[in-house]
Design a protein with these regions (language model features):
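Bacterial N-terminal signal peptides
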Residues: 10-23
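Short intrinsically disordered, low-complexity coil segments enriched in acidic
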Residues: 1, 21, 108-109
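N-terminal secretory signal peptides that target proteins for export/translocation
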Residues: 1-8
Length: 128
């Protein structure tokens, strides 16, 4: 192969590599977290990331959630925890999982008995 052919192939390779590189930024941008407040009490605020909601082929979804504990005296945030919540929309059940988990890792489903934050999280998440 002559020098001209080599330069042409190198240019084509660089061009396509650049296109692949740029397309990865588009994916990162679309995966941006968008926290939406879904419930609040005097002791805490529950958020969901609307962009993280994923349904499986049944009526079960996963959503990234964030809970911020609030000091009731001065309304400052004391601590924040993020986790993945699996939600059975049909039966209004939930399961908390580590952030990088998958829906098939759900072992037990819980009812949101007397938990306003979880109930509202289920209702809001299932409305998407």
């Amino acid at each position: 192969m002559n020098l001209r052919g080599f330069i042409k192939q190198a240019f084509i390779f660089c061009f396509f590599s650049f296109l692949i590189f740029l397309s990865s930024f588009n994916r990162l941008e679309s995966a941006e977290i968008e926290w939406i407040e879904v419930a609040k009490t005097t002791n805490g605020i529950q958020f969901i990331d609307r962009n993280s909601i994923k349904y499986n082929n049944r009526s079960i979804l996963s959503v990234l959630t964030k809970y911020s504990e609030i000091n009731p005296d001065d309304q400052t945030i004391v601590s924040t925890n993020s986790y993945l919540m699996a939600i059975d929309c049909e039966n209004r059940l939930f399961s908390k999982l580590p952030v990088n988990s998958k829906l098939d890792q759900v072992k037990n489903w819980d009812e949101p008995i007397n938990d306003k934050l979880i109930k509202k999280t289920i209702i809001n998440s299932c409305s998407y």
